[in-house]
């Protein structure tokens, strides 16, 4: 069954605050094999002009995917998550994510398109400090396989 087009433009409430810790940044950097000292050493980060260690750019996926839960668990959308694959991910950083940041994320359904029997769900995650400072915009495309009517075009 196709996804509900009326969800385009729907904004979900902000996530609970997420405090970015130095150890989480180190763990993520290790997991993606990013050896830059700015992710591990506060002095190296300060020498590079940052107030504390900074996260690798893709660290934002932790916050964006956490926020996506509101969309994918919304039964009214009609999404069967067992048929979903991740199609695309882009980040626009307004500033680096830093240790000590307290961030929240608001997600918006930007688009739903039917292609070749699949629905393409585009979700935008706006990551900000709890004070409202923009930090990152993450845009994800999820492919819901076999949900659209065959032959539908958006």
Functional labels for PLM-detected ranges:
Residues 1-3, 88, 93-154:
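HotDog/MaoC-like acyl-thioester-processing domains
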Residues 1-88, 149-154:
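Hot-dog-fold acyl-thioester-processing enzymes
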């Amino acid at each position: 069954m196709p996804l509900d087009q009326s969800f385009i433009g729907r904004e979900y409430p902000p996530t609970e605050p997420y405090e970015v810790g130095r150890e989480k940044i180190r763990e993520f950097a290790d997991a993606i094999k990013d050896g830059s000292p700015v992710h591990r050493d506060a002095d190296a980060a300060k020498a590079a002009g940052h107030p504390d260690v900074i996260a690798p750019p893709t660290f934002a996926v932790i916050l964006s995917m956490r926020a996506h839960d509101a969309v994918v668990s919304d039964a009214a959308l009609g999404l069967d998550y067992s048929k979903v694959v991740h199609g695309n991910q882009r980040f626009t950083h307004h500033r680096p994510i830093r240790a000590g940041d307290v961030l929240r994320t608001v997600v918006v359904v930007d688009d739903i398109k039917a292609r070749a029997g699949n629905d393409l769900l585009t979700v935008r995650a706006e990551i900000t400090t709890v004070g409202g400072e923009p930090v990152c915009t993450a845009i994800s495309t999820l492919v819901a396989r076999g949900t659209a009517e065959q032959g539908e075009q958006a």
